[in-house]
Amino acid sequence: MDKKDLGEVEYLDRVIAINRTAKVVKGGRRFRFSAIVVVGDGNGSVGAGLGKAHEVPEAIRKGMEQAKKSMTKIEIEKGTIPYEVIGKFGAGRVLLKPASEGTGLIAGGAVRAVLEVAGIHNILTKCLGSHNPHNLVKATIEGLCRLESPGRIAASRGKSISEI
């Protein structure tokens, strides 16, 4: 896990996957690389990006730039999420369940990296459907973006938190 110091904000970044593609030309194969990168501040902000280039470091750099531009704020309560939610993107679905203190981060692969950079420490997850890293990253972020704090839900309904 790397920390990048940009001005006042320190970002955590993770490379999820690097893919190599080949274009066959008369003189041989021409390779290009793509990299899926997630970036977060460890305190409720997370973003994902896909960078493509002829070299791996350049693809990672482009992915990090795109991830920083797509950062969104998510609701975190005491190191976990307020309630259970399913994030969907394409054929990938991710079930996210809140967990009590001390449970840890029960997640694998792409989902784990997204949750780590977002700053979530106690959560249970299950990948349903596709296990494609592109879809899992986007489904996880989509599920986290759908979360709202109980206070905000109560205010939108015009009720107190205890009534909900």
Swiss-Prot record:
Keywords: Ribonucleoprotein, Ribosomal protein, RNA-binding, rRNA-binding. PROSITE patterns: RIBOSOMAL_S5, S5_DSRBD. InterPro entries: Ribosomal_Su5_D2-typ_SF (IPR020568), Ribosomal_uS5 (IPR000851), Ribosomal_uS5_bac-type (IPR005712), Ribosomal_uS5_C (IPR005324), Ribosomal_uS5_N (IPR013810), Ribosomal_uS5_N_CS (IPR018192), Ribsml_uS5_D2-typ_fold_subgr (IPR014721). The keyword Nucleotidyltransferase does not apply. The keyword Ribonucleoprotein applies. GO terms for biological process: translation. It holds the Pfam family Ribosomal_S5. One of its GO terms (cellular component) is small ribosomal subunit. Disulfide bonds: none annotated. Residues 11-74 form the S5 DRBM domain. GO terms for molecular function: rRNA binding; structural constituent of ribosome. Belongs to the universal ribosomal protein uS5 family. With S4 and S12 plays an important role in translational accuracy. PANTHER family: MITOCHONDRIAL RIBOSOMAL PROTEIN S5. The N-terminal domain interacts with the head of the 30S subunit; the C-terminal domain interacts with the body and contacts protein S4. The interaction surface between S4 and S5 is involved in control of translational fidelity. Part of the 30S ribosomal subunit. Contacts proteins S4 and S8. This is Small ribosomal subunit protein uS5. It comes from Syntrophus aciditrophicus (strain SB). The lineage of its organism: Bacteria, Pseudomonadati, Thermodesulfobacteriota, Syntrophia, Syntrophales.
